[in-house]
UniProtKB/Swiss-Prot annotation:
BP GO terms, sorted: poly(A)+ mRNA export from nucleus
Pfam families registered for this protein in UniProt: Beta-prop_Nup120_160, HEAT_Nup120, NUP120_helical
Annotated gene: nup120
Protein name: Nucleoporin nup120
GO CC field: nuclear envelope; nuclear periphery; nuclear pore; nuclear pore outer ring
Highest taxon, organism lineage: Eukaryota
Keyword annotations from UniProtKB, A to Z: Nucleus, Transport
Chain's role: Functions as a component of the nuclear pore complex (NPC). NPC components, collectively referred to as nucleoporins (NUPs), can play the role of both NPC structural components and of docking or interaction partners for transiently associated nuclear transport factors. Active directional transport is assured by both, a Phe-Gly (FG) repeat affinity gradient for these transport factors across the NPC and a transport cofactor concentration gradient across the nuclear envelope.
Record organism: Schizosaccharomyces pombe (strain 972 / ATCC 24843)
Length: 1136
């Protein structure tokens, strides 16, 4: 079970290779919406936000066995009322099929154990049943296309909601899906009902199943127990499973009875009386069946501190069913850690038949406490005499828990060393990044001294950014006052306070990350032979880990364990290595931290005196105080008994340095595996480091002993020590920097002068991310020109993770392209330094810079690419738009098409000036005449020029397009952009003789569409100015009169301000008409007194002469005079 740790994957990484999320909201039934006031009040509580958004309270895996193949869905329910579903099915290349995950939002919380699945072979859809706390049953059709298409079509009846009558009086408790239209629901206070749904007309009916084997008596009914608030009826079902092979429901009730219900007749056909336990039964999945044959049922029974289990075989004959006990066995207490006094509870258990066999089974049991999780398994074999043999094993799975033993502060350690050790201590474990972020937010909110680099929200940060934020926040909280004698600060007090703050933060991280350690369920996928361990925010895999090829055969473990069988001559060397590893295991974390700092000092500055003295001092300082003297004596006796230990150690080390960990196979690694390379590298390098340190510890022990026989057998160990020290230098350096595999590398780092000539030559030949990483750090590790054997092994072996086949390729480019298509722009930016100078790589750099709002770098990369890109259009999806443009214009003028494509890309990212530059380059680089291409380029120039505010260029492009069908849409963009940027005078000054009437019609349409004639920009005024400029005085006066008429008709109360507006506009109309000859002083305006016809395009009009308008003007003047007189009279009365 050690492979369990290596198969743990955080839930957020499951969406790493997805393009997006399909969010769905189910319709709410009456009173099915819960109050969100609590959520609003606690929105700023980081801890509750973390638990609500990142920690599930129910999870599982459902596999639908189809004739065309299986579909595996992993689902989780979070406290924000969201059901998240991942389609984790794989294709023949072990790559994920889905592109999207599905999030279904409910108006109220979904019940624990309130989700069930069924599959319809006819419609190829998965049915989801969900029951909420509001007692509403939801019937959801989950289509396979939802995981593959961004615009998946939803049928009107994709979700149906019901509230069965039995739900009104009783609280639902457990549910089992029988078919695509039938479910069985048990109730909290007893009872069972079968609900049959008819999705066609959204109807349903119930069949209540009576339990004739239990009769209530008046005495029991009137007992004192029945009046308790937490009373549950004895026939309450606390666990049930459905066996599809036999169409039966197996149930366990509170009255200690195991029952079999035949669903075809709704009759109980078998009942087994169980002995009462010392612990009360509660709602818990006590029952499980093998998912392959459906014939064997396992029952957990809490009859002692750890309980026991029984396995029953279901024998069916027509409608007769019989449960026969195959085995009854007590559970052996698992090996618990030091917290054995903390209560342990059973979390879940699962029975698995081995490849459909009816003689071999695997029983997996999950235990949990407040601090740890233990996975226990039992291998069961049914012998010919029908007796079972069991073999127990367990695995302590505390992968996300920071060690509880914290080190003491050494007196010779600086404050910087303390902070560095704590950073490594926190980030070295498989702690989720979200928990560290939330811990940092909580830490900053509780510390008033933190002011710099303060996080404002819960979001995505790179590891280096998060480390810097943690370091600056914790250091800034320490405030030390000067000593009383004013000689300086108390440095030792500063180190003590710094250590306390780091310890407080580490415990907070462990506390938050522990929320996700609870095991929610265990599921077996028989089609893929995978067992899923579902944690609250993680998922683990037993046997064949999902998406991680050969992870259960961890490379170095496989190497170490196979040395004896592969090469018998290495047996002695392996035994010596085992001694060194045992000596290494005696050291605590704080001791190892000090030892590694000492080794680092030795690497940086080798002593000028004897190496034997160095090893002796190393032993006295680090080994002797921390290891039992009796154990040291035992080690010495073992070493003396060896015949030729130096030869054995040298042979083993050479094997370690040259062993090919991964075979170069033709299997295609999944994208997820490439993303997990940092974890793989970290695991392998840690084991290398432990092995090397074990040998160094042994050498220091040997040189410190005054034993002639021992010294003679290890002659020449000083040279071996120097060799091991160099290996340790490389491994430690790569281990400390392995997190950089997904960190940001600046593009300029490739040309850094810090890299020597050998490094630059190595960079020229690399074609994988890991090789790039190793070559870039080459100058830090070695000063000699020849690469060491271990360094070559690290590069050749670990880089095989990235290699698709034996031929050279650039998988880094393909990886970055996939990340870009999946909209993982932050990850792309972190990998940008790994891209080489190929045209497609430079093009990808430009796209990444563009998405990161670094347009200057993007344009520089765009200009350095060439038309060689066109030969890659069929290989890379990011070039699909360029390919479509080139095909549209018959593969002519490729350079112009490419510049046009770049202009569109830059325009999409609001880089308008650069987009205009490339559109002009596209026009200038045309080699042959193509009218359609010219129109497309001119149109793009118009759009980009308008958006960039370069209206002179836009005006030129508009006049070119004045004779094309695009003129109306282009004119609309031109006018809108000018008015939006306040360039109205510039619009009026442009000469557009061929578009004069089009501009007039456009402005008139916009004027008539105005709701408030006083809003800005006022299209009435713009149209008046346009007509006035072109000496169209009659229509200019008419449009102002239209504005005036609409103003009067929509104004209810006319005061001083309104009178002024009316008088001013009448004067504008009259002054404009005065410019016309007397016989032409008339206008046509809309007649407001006539009701409009049904035809919206027809507007009744009337003719107004100058005299009529003057008469209206005089009436307005009289109204003004009356209003002024009334105001003066009122004022005089007040004075009197």
């Amino acid at each position: 079970m050690n492979e369990l740790k290596h198969a743990v994957v955080p839930i957020d990484l499951q969406s790493f290779c997805l393009e997006g999320t399909l969010a769905l909201w189910v319709p709410a039934l009456e009173n099915d919406s819960e109050d969100d006031s609590e959520a609003i009040e606690t929105a700023d509580d980081n801890e509750k936000l973390f638990k609500k958004e990142c920690v599930a309270y129910d999870a599982g895996v459902y596999t639908s066995n189809k004739s065309k193949g299986s579909q595996t869905l992993r689902w989780s329910i979070f406290q924000n009322r969201t059901l998240t579903i991942f389609d984790v099915s794989l294709n023949s290349k072990k790559e994920p099929l889905s592109k999207f995950n599905v999030k279904i939002h409910f108006p109220s919380n979904v019940m624990k154990d309130g989700v069930a699945f069924s599959f319809s072979e006819h419609s190829d859809t998965t049915i989801i049943y969900a029951i909420t706390h509001a007692r509403v049953l939801y019937y959801i059709r989950l289509s396979k296309t939802w995981f593959q298409l961004p615009d998946a079509r939803l049928d009107d009846d994709w979700c149906l909601c019901y509230r069965p009558i039995s739900f009104l009086n009783q609280k639902p408790d457990l549910m089992a899906a029988i078919s695509t239209s039938e479910i069985c629901v048990s109730f909290f206070n007893g009872g069972l009902t079968k609900i049959i749904l008819n999705p066609k007309d959204a109807s349903h009916y119930e069949q209540h199943i009576d339990d004739s084997s239990y009769l209530f008596s008046l005495k029991k009914y009137l007992s004192l127990q029945a009046f308790k608030a937490d009373y549950r009826s004895p026939n309450t079902i606390i666990s049930m499973i459905f066996l599809s092979t036999y169409n039966v429901l197996v149930m366990l009730s509170l009255d200690y009875k195991l029952k079999v219900l035949d669903l075809s007749t709704n009759q109980c056909v078998e009942t087994i009386e169980l002995s009462q336990t010392i612990l009360p039964l509660q709602s818990f999945p006590y029952l499980t069946s093998d998912h392959t044959t459906n014939s064997f049922i396992a029952l957990y029974y809490p009859d002692n501190s750890h309980g026991s289990f029984s396995i029953y075989k279901l024998n069916a004959n027509a409608h007769s069913f019989k449960l026969n006990v195959v085995i009854e066995k007590g559970i052996i207490p698992p090996s618990l850690p030091d917290d054995e006094f903390i209560p342990w509870m059973l979390s879940d258990f699962q029975l698995i038949s081995s490849e459909g066999s009816q003689s071999k089974f695997l029983l997996i049991i999950a235990w949990k406490s407040n601090l740890n999780t233990v996975i226990q398994k039992c291998n069961l074999s049914l012998d010919q005499d029908e007796s079972f043999s069991c073999v127990w094993s367990h695995s302590l799975d505390s992968f996300s828990l920071i060690e509880k033993t914290f080190f003491d502060v050494p007196t010779n350690m600086s404050s910087g060393d303390i902070s560095e050790i704590w950073l490594q201590h926190i980030f070295a474990h498989n702690t989720s990044i979200e928990s560290i972020q939330v811990a940092l937010l909580s830490f900053q909110n509780s510390s008033s001294q933190v002011s710099k680099n303060k996080l404002d929200k819960f979001g995505a940060l790179t590891i280096s950014e998060l480390k810097n934020a943690v370091l600056s926040s914790i250091v800034s909280t320490i405030q030390i006052e000067p000593n009383s004698d004013l000689t300086g600060y108390d440095y030792y007090e500063y180190k003590r306070l710094l250590y306390n703050e780091w310890e407080r933060f580490a415990k907070l991280v462990a506390y938050l990350d522990h929320f996700g350690d609870e095991i929610l369920s265990i599921n077996f996928d028989p089609s893929n032979a995978v067992t899923y361990i579902n944690y609250a925010n993680k998922v683990a895999f037993i046997r064949d880990p999902y998406l991680i090829e050969s992870f259960d055969e961890e490379p170095l473990t496989k190497l170490i364990s196979s040395l004896e069988t592969d090469d018998p001559s290495l047996i002695e060397g392996y035994q010596i290595l085992d001694l060194g590893r045992s000596l290494h295991s005696c050291m605590s974390f704080s001791t190892l931290s000090e030892i590694r700092y000492s080794l680092r000092e030795l690497v940086q500055d080798l002593p000028s005196y004897s190496l034997f003295d160095t090893l002796w001092v190393f032993y006295d300082k680090h080994i002797y105080p921390n290891v039992d003297p009796d154990y040291i004596s035992t080690l010495i006796d073992t070493l003396v008994s060896l015949e030729n230990p130096m030869r054995d150690i040298d042979s083993l080390i050479q094997r370690l340095r040259s062993f090919d960990i991964y075979n170069h196979s033709a299997q295609s690694p999944s994208l997820f595996l490439c993303a997990s390379v940092a974890r793989v590298l970290d695991s392998i390098l840690k084991k290398f480091q432990v092995s090397i340190e074990g040998f160094i510890f042994l050498l220091s022990l040997i040189t410190s002993q005054q034993d002639y026989e021992l010294q003679s057998k290890f002659a020449g160990c000083d040279k071996l020590f120097l060799s091991l020290l160099e290996d340790w230098r490389l491994v430690s350096f790569l281990l400390e920097n392995s997190a950089l595999l997904l960190e940001k590398f600046e593009e300029e780092d490739v040309d850094s002068t810090n890299c020597n000539l050998n490094t630059m030559e190595a960079l020229a030949s690399v074609n994988t991310a890991l090789q790039f990483f190793s070559a870039l750090n080459y100058s830090e590790c070695f000063s000699e020109s020849q690469i060491s054997p271990l360094h070559a092994t690290v590069i050749s072996s670990l880089s095989a993770i990235f290699i698709r086949d034996d031929t050279e390729n650039d998988l880094v480019t393909e990886l970055v392209e996939k990340l870009f298509l999946f909209k993982q722009y932050n990850a792309c930016m972190q990998l940008i330094g790994w891209l080489n100078s190929d045209p497609i790589a430079v093009y990808l750099k430009a796209l990444i810079y563009l998405k990161s709002k670094e347009a200057v770098k993007a344009v520089r990369c765009f200009k350095t690419t060439s038309l060689v890109l066109y030969s890659h259009t069929s290989q890379f999806a990011v070039l699909r738009e360029f390919q479509e443009i080139a095909e549209k214009y018959h593969h002519q003028n490729l350079l112009s098409c490419y510049y046009l494509h770049l202009s569109k890309k830059l325009f999409e990212e609001s880089a308008y000036i650069d987009a205009l530059e490339f559109s002009l380059l596209a026009d200038a680089s045309k080699e042959t005449d193509d009218e359609d291409l010219s129109i497309a380029i001119t149109h793009e120039t118009l759009k980009t020029a308008c958006a960039a505010g370069k209206f002179d260029a836009a005006h030129v492009a508009l006049m070119v397009l004045s004779t094309t069908p695009l003129k109306k849409s282009c004119l609309l963009d031109f006018v809108n952009q000018l008015t939006k940027q306040g360039k109205i005078n510039q619009l009026l000054n442009y000469s557009m003789p061929t578009l004069r009437q089009d501009v007039d019609n456009l402005l008139e349409r916009k004027a008539f569409q105005m709701i408030n004639v006083e809003s800005q920009p006022c299209w009435y005024n713009i149209l008046f100015s346009w007509r006035y400029k072109h000496q169209n005085y009659r229509d200019a006066a008419a449009i102002i009169y239209e504005k005036l008429s609409r103003y009067i008709s929509t104004t209810e109360l006319i005061g001083k301000k309104e009178r002024t507006f009316i008088i001013e506009h009448y004067l504008i109309v009259l002054n404009t008409l005065e410019l016309l000859p007397k016989e032409d002083t008339w206008i046509l305006v809309t007649d407001m007194s006539v009701d409009k016809e049904p035809d919206p395009n027809f507007l009744p009009q009337k003719l107004l002469t100058l005299d009529a308008i003057v008469a209206e003007y005089h009436l307005q003047l009289k109204d003004v005079a009356v209003q002024v007189t009334a105001e003066m009279s009122s004022a005089m009365n007040i004075d009197l």
